[in-house]
Amino acid sequence: AVGELKLNPGRADYPDEGYRSRFSHATEKAAPGYYEVMLDDYGIKAQLTATQRVGIHKYTFPKGKDGHLVLDLVHGIYNYDGKVLWANLRVENDTLLTGYRITNGWARTNYTYFAISLSQPIREYGYKDKEKVRYNGFWRRFNMEKNFPEITGRKIVAYFNFDTVKESELVVKVALSAVSTEGAIKNLHAEASRKSFEELAEAARTDWNNELDHFEAEGTADQKAMLYTSLYHTMINPSVYMDVDGSYRGLDHNIHQAKGFTNYTIFSLWDTYRAEHPFLNLVKPERSVDMVESMIKHEQQSVHRMLPVWSLMGNENWCM
């Protein structure tokens, strides 16, 4: 954001009260591995791409304006009171943030660790803890709301200010891990370190082209769009659920090592057994072998000794 700093998301019917922004579909550009849009309220161009474990953001701020970045550890795709069990954020230095967020919900105990690298140094930062009931012991002896390097809680929203007057572009690389912040840092270094946004976006484009080039089809433009969109969807889930060193969080919430296979999660088996998995057996047999091995590990880690019903982020949802 630019201008007045807001730490509430705002309502859909009144976006001016929060940090959300209006946008027009006319400024959107979307392709496998890439998304771009103009945030009209702030005049910020947002571009997104990804590697397997790292999301890369590029924000171009208006010339002559300081930039703000809001890190909301409360809100997600769907929200309700009590969803966030605990969250932590550390400012390791002026270009590296680490932390984690533990949530319940469909995945009853979902651990998400992160490491965030910034292309420009932080000028100043602060937090808001929106929890109504808080521990007010030793930690509250510090002024933790501004330039304090660590914050924990259930309803944490942080802000970071940057001097973007001279350099208007800010690249943010967000690496994820279900294991640890150390694992997230390893993922960041292995997949996105020392590479520009443009290089990473081009690599994502190449990877998706390699995936989608397995088929040649004849037909109308609409028919081809339907085919390749469906093919694209089959390559999203099940998804890889392990760090670059093979570490992953198992169904028993212990840390395991995937030896000789790639560990997967998100098995919506009630509807994928009919079409997607037979399809993957034909076009990606090596991937199917890894998925079967992942299901076997799920069974071995299950206190019920059951294969997955509906596996999500290393949790059994007992759904469908």
Where are these regions (language model features)?
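Beta-sandwich/jelly-roll carbohydrate-recognition scaffolds of carbohydrate-active enzymes
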Residues: 1-264, 297
